[in-house]
Amino acid sequence: MKKVFYPLACCLAAGVLVSCSGQKKAGSAQEEQSANEVAVSYSKSLKAAEMDSLQLPVDADGYITIFDGKTFNGWRGYGKDRVPSKWTIEDGCIKFNGSGGGEAQDGDGGDLIFAHKFKNFELEMEWKVSKGGNSGIFYLAQEVTSKDKDGNDVLEPIYISAPEYQVLDNDNHPDAKLGKDNNRQSASLYDMIPAVPQNAKPFGEWNKAKIMVYKGTVVHGQNDENVLEYHLWTKQWTDLLQASKFSQDKWPLAFELLNNCGGENHEGFIGMQDHGDDVWFRNIRVKVLD
């Protein structure tokens, strides 16, 4: 199916921000993709919410601190110009206050992004989840809108364009037993590559996450061990997508966006997932590698 891609005019200049009320779950998105040709646009971030990474402090190791433990400076909701109220700061951590309502809820919930696009980088943070908790860390994310059957703009979910580092209570969440070869457990490339070794700590304890992206090579680390590696924009990457829920047959739009992950410039946002459960993140820092 052919898709039409075009840049969206700056939302700030137009005084328009795409509403998250149009965000769809995977099933409805797939149904629309199979029925209609879809025009897709990369929703340009609001200029008022952009963050110049040069304004942020750099530590002795060369990392940019993108969360200062006190404020949401540089952060906003995915597809929004503010931080949704279910994301709070607690004891020096970013916390999502879950409601058990499932992923990317409208209104006061939704995913959180840092409003600066990174290209080649190393990302480090710590995370913990509540019992049975589920979340994720996204990278190279775009803000993508499509047209529904009536021609209205709808905001697509963040995971339609971004690889996901899974954040999960492996012992108590059913997703840990789904997928293939444990590829939905913590630190896995969600639904594609399992984390090996699987060394996650249980719910309520802090885990260390590390993601390196450099010229297409991606490495996931968990608790000071590298657990997987893959290569974007290669046949291997396309084959991984085709074997996943994001295949060309199952979800054409996701396949097209992820196969060209990061868009034309191979860069994108870092994000944290609202999956309806309590989750905490802290000590978030990024080293630019180019």
Swiss-Prot record:
Q: Which reaction does it catalyse?
A: 3-dehydro-alpha,alpha-trehalose + H2O = 3-dehydro-D-glucose + D-glucose
- Presence of the UniProt keyword Signal in the record: yes
Lipid linkage positions (S-diacylglycerol cysteine): 20
Q: What is its EC number?
A: 3.2.1.218
Per the record, its GO cellular-component terms are:
plasma membrane
Lipidation sites (N-palmitoyl cysteine): 20
Official protein name in the record: 3-keto-disaccharide hydrolase
Query: What organism, scientifically named, is this protein from?
Result: Bacteroides thetaiotaomicron (strain ATCC 29148 / DSM 2079 / JCM 5827 / CCUG 10774 / NCTC 10582 / VPI-5482 / E50)
